[in-house]
């Protein structure tokens, strides 16, 4: 039986992870769960899965949780709680918390020799070199939960990495595919949150609308698969049936296809390298799949993807700046403080102003993250 800790169990990926685990109760034991604010849902999860330990935002949330529960469970709090919970006896830590908050707990879990199922983008975007060096040193598995990276992992299995010509990440194009800059000047938050294919959290949905999500995935792919950025391409595939592809040096292309359901890559990360039948899963019906189309991304309109490639090429703390500026800019947009196109403008401005640190420590990364966010917040949150 695999012992599992889920960081961010009340979010989109966390709830779907527990949904998958419900199908395989005999294979998994939930050791720990964490939530930020959603004490009500966490209470239900505790009753259903009986974890030994949980962590919440602060002591107020901990007190709310104690009032909700009749059972005795250890409750940790704050960022220290996230770091402490991964030290408990477990085989796998699912990192589904959003933001830079996931970085130190992930590093701590790796140092403890635990395998990682990674759904947090910031970990590799900001500290890819540090994290992957540690993964190799500790000889643990770091498995992607993203559908695109899971697809690439599956397409690479059984093949020699030296034979890879390029990785091809697919993008749906988001709700504004085909639009030009002029069309996007006055788009609303609701329009940007209306993703055509995937049901996700608000932050990642906006990142999909700007194509920054795909930019983050390019950065993650470099570190996950140890490949240079000039061998990672992005293609827009509106149907979201092909989740990514690997092209080999003989011209062959291997693709992974599936319905747009996050439970598939979650299941693969939980059970790797085996596969099991998932109850309630919709299988592809090729008789209903009338076409698979592809187009180049519009880098002029969707500047965020270009900025991600640029940050990756520069390296060092520039990817931390990219991530921090995006996080604040998206928050400003969601709170109707800025317009949609200003997201890319704020990120580009932050990158231009940054004095890059080429070989950063974890402290450098966390400090740069805080500095960038504070600077943008001061300027726009008046």
Swiss-Prot record:
SUPFAM superfamilies in the record: 1-deoxy-D-xylulose-5-phosphate reductoisomerase, C-terminal domain, Glyceraldehyde-3-phosphate dehydrogenase-like, C-terminal domain, NAD(P)-binding Rossmann-fold domains
Transmembrane regions: none
Record pathway: Isoprenoid biosynthesis; isopentenyl diphosphate biosynthesis via DXP pathway; isopentenyl diphosphate from 1-deoxy-D-xylulose 5-phosphate: step 1/6
Swiss-Prot/TrEMBL cofactor(s): Mg(2+); Mn(2+)
Keyword hit for NADP: yes
Presence of the UniProt keyword Transferase in the record: no
HAMAP family xrefs: DXP_reductoisom
NCBIfam families documented for this protein: Dxr, PRK12464.1
Similarity comment: Belongs to the DXR family.
Biological function: Catalyzes the NADPH-dependent rearrangement and reduction of 1-deoxy-D-xylulose-5-phosphate (DXP) to 2-C-methyl-D-erythritol 4-phosphate (MEP).
Protein name (record): 1-deoxy-D-xylulose 5-phosphate reductoisomerase
Species this protein is from: Thermoanaerobacter sp. (strain X514)
Gene (UniProt): dxr
